[in-house]
């Protein structure tokens, strides 16, 4: 008979996978309608011209063009998509 009780398995050793958040299309990259530009929690980046925001704060393109980041009032960062014809 064993004189020492068997050790139980550890209760730790699990972790959830990352949420794959962040910038997916960077400044001056070409996008088409529906392309995801940024996945985020909350509004670190705000939607600007020609972009939309999903209910999970994902920013996506509404038109074909190029991604542009700019600072607005109160140092907020806005994401725009500039039309191909307006970029020279």
Swiss-Prot record:
Gene Ontology cellular-component annotations: ribonucleoprotein complex; ribosome
GO molecular function, one example? structural constituent of ribosome
Which PROSITE patterns does the record cross-reference, listed alphabetically? RIBOSOMAL_L27
Q: Which residues cross the membrane?
A: none
Which residue intervals make up region (Disordered)? 1-24
Provide the alphabetized UniProt keywords.
Ribonucleoprotein, Ribosomal protein
Tell me one GO biological process term: translation
Q: Which HAMAP family match?
A: Ribosomal_bL27 (MF_00539)
Family named by the database record: Belongs to the bacterial ribosomal protein bL27 family.
What name goes with this protein? Large ribosomal subunit protein bL27
Organism, as annotated: Ehrlichia canis (strain Jake)
Q: What lineage, starting at the top, does this entry show?
A: Bacteria, Pseudomonadati, Pseudomonadota, Alphaproteobacteria, Rickettsiales
